[in-house]
Swiss-Prot record:
PANTHER family: AMINOGLYCOSIDE PHOSPHOTRANSFERASE DOMAIN-CONTAINING PROTEIN (PTHR21064:SF6), AMINOGLYCOSIDE PHOSPHOTRANSFERASE DOMAIN-CONTAINING PROTEIN-RELATED (PTHR21064). This is Homoserine kinase. It comes from Nitrobacter hamburgensis (strain DSM 10229 / NCIMB 13809 / X14). Keywords: Amino-acid biosynthesis, ATP-binding, Kinase, Nucleotide-binding, Threonine biosynthesis, Transferase. Its EC number is 2.7.1.39. It catalyses: L-homoserine + ATP = O-phospho-L-homoserine + ADP + H(+). GO terms for biological process: threonine biosynthetic process. InterPro entries: Aminoglycoside_PTrfase, Homoserine_kinase_II, Kinase-like_dom_sf, Pseudomonas-type_ThrB. Pathway: Amino-acid biosynthesis; L-threonine biosynthesis; L-threonine from L-aspartate: step 4/5. Belongs to the pseudomonas-type ThrB family.
């Protein structure tokens, strides 16, 4: 979450008159993440999140995101729910931006994920994939393999200012992934951004999944690969096979990965690493002046990509291919 658009107190108070969520007591911007402007609201009725949608979030995609959260909640997935205004609409306009109020979930995201966290995330991700099977709306992944070259070209003039030789390294990897990307793996609704800061816990109990604004239709195993990169590396950039074993095993107990998915996982993990490397790189090079936002380090994903390039098969994630039992 982040703040790109400032909201005046009187403007916000007028906006909230359309909702039955009490009177505004206080609000503050949240300076985490890089995509939308987010505020935590405290009203006489409780706490809520206000999101103003900008950058990569297209207005036409918002019914998919908001509808998906409602659908998943009815299928047992704990996630935020949009608060509808008195006119029945979940989407409004504030400070010239599309805006929505989302209910507040208890919990904090884990700054130091442990094995128990990883297992909980694996199980929750599989349940999300199963719960989304009958969601009627569709959204293509706008940040899948076909989008990576335009991102690379956007960053090209400045890539080597971030790290010498990075341009040629990324070009070679992009060429490889475009040639070898899978075509026919099991697919459906995926979260596509299930990083630790998008998963809430109360102690070691998972209490909610948040930030569905990259959700789309794509390979289930690609979503798993994103989580391997996001959850299973240590601060010293080493890969923790114990965490990977916990995440993959818990996922597989809820939804079994096919042989084709297992075989493709190392390549998908390379793609997942490149996708986040490129978007971080573009964001790092294009932070608006004065924005209350902390761009994430693209070089973290250079290290993760180099590791994933070294992985030959799923066994190197600490599991056996047959039944995912080490």
């Amino acid at each position: 979450m982040a703040v790109y658009t400032d909201v005046a107190a009187d403007e916000l108070a007028d906006f909230l008159k359309a909702y039955d969520i009490g009177e505004l007591l206080s609000y503050k911007g949240i300076a985490e993440g890089v995509e939308n402007s987010n505020y935590l609201l405290h009203t006489t009725a409780g706490s809520f999140f206000l999101t103003l949608y900008e950058k990569r979030v297209a207005v036409d995609d918002l019914p998919f995101f908001l509808g998906l959260m409602g659908h998943l909640a009815t299928h047992g997935i704990v996630c935020p729910q949009p608060v509808k205004a008195r006119n029945g609409e979940a989407l409004g306009c504030l400070a010239g931006r599309p805006a929505a109020i989302i209910d507040f979930l208890e919990g904090v995201w884990p700054r130091k994920p442990n094995v128990t966290h990883c297992a909980a995330v694996g199980a929750a991700l599989a349940k999300l994939h199963l719960a989304g099977r009958d969601f009627p709306m569709r959204r293509a992944n706008a940040l899948s393999v076909s989008s990576w070259r335009p991102l690379f070209e956007q960053a090209t003039p400045c890539i080597d200012t971030v790290q010498h030789g990075l341009h040629d390294f990324l070009k070679a990897e992009l060429d490889h992934l475009e040639r070898h990307w899978p075509q026919n793996l099991p697919a459906g609704v995926i979260h596509a951004d299930l990083f630790p800061d998008n998963v809430l816990f109360l102690g070691d109990r998972l209490s909610g999944l948040i930030d569905f604004y990259f959700a789309c239709n794509d390979f289930f195993a690609y979503d798993v690969a994103i989580c391997l990169n996001a959850w299973c590396f240590e601060p010293d950039h080493s890969f923790n096979v114990t965490k990977a074993r916990a995440l993959l095993g818990a996922y597989n107990r809820e939804r079994a990965l096919s042989e084709a998915e297992q075989a493709a996982l190392p390549l998908l993990a390379r793609g997942a690493a490149l996708r986040f490397l490129l978007t971080r790189l573009v964001d790092f090079l294009n932070v608006p002046a004065g924005a209350l936002v902390k761009p994430k380090d693209p070089l973290e994903y250079v290290r993760k990509l180099r590791f994933q390039q070294s992985v030959g098969n799923i066994r190197e994630y600490g599991v056996a291919a047959s039944g995912l039992v080490a």
